[in-house]
Amino acid sequence: MKKLKLTIALSLFATAVSVNLNAQDTNTDNHTITISIPEVALVDIEPSATKNITLGFTAPTEAGNPLTPSAANTTLWLNYSSIKSVADPTRNVTVKLNAIIPGIDIHVTAAPASGSGAGTLGTSAGLLTLSAADQTIISGIGSAYTGNGANNGHNLTYALAAGSGPGGVAVYSDLQATATTVATVTYTISDN
């Protein structure tokens, strides 16, 4: 009987020690972190307070000369933020004009990206003559941001041309005198 009691006591002691050993912490542990990264596609023109510009022409002072366009405007900057999805390798920014002005070509050029941005910034298409159809002005945008505000992103240069100049489509004979004509330029960032 003594042997049985001793065997039972030793068994219970071994079980208790075993349970204690299993309940102790080890020298490593782990946990999970769930991360959410949103898809982002944002574009704007800066500085936003003064993004509406005025361009025009000066009448010739000598007979036989054409209209002279005002100096090009270089005050605006194209900013964007992009986090692409796995399914979409890159994004583009397109530009279009809502109203064609007879006899006038409106040119826009986006300079290479500069400023405080990072990531896979897009590449400029160079000089475009604006039309009612979407045209790609920036291509190859990956996950990137240009930085916000003036002096960040792509500097935009707007210039006017009367009639058909290099790369132009307007016809000089279509020009009509007008005090002011307003056209809206729209930029859109989208997946390829």
Annotate each predicted stretch with a short phrase.
Residues K5, V17-Q24:
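Sec/Tat signal peptide C-region and signal peptidase I cleavage site
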Residues M1-T7:
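Bacterial Sec-dependent N-terminal signal peptides
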Residues Q24-L130, Q135, S139-N192:
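N-terminal small/polar-rich segments of proteins
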Residues A9-A16:
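Bacterial N-terminal signal peptides
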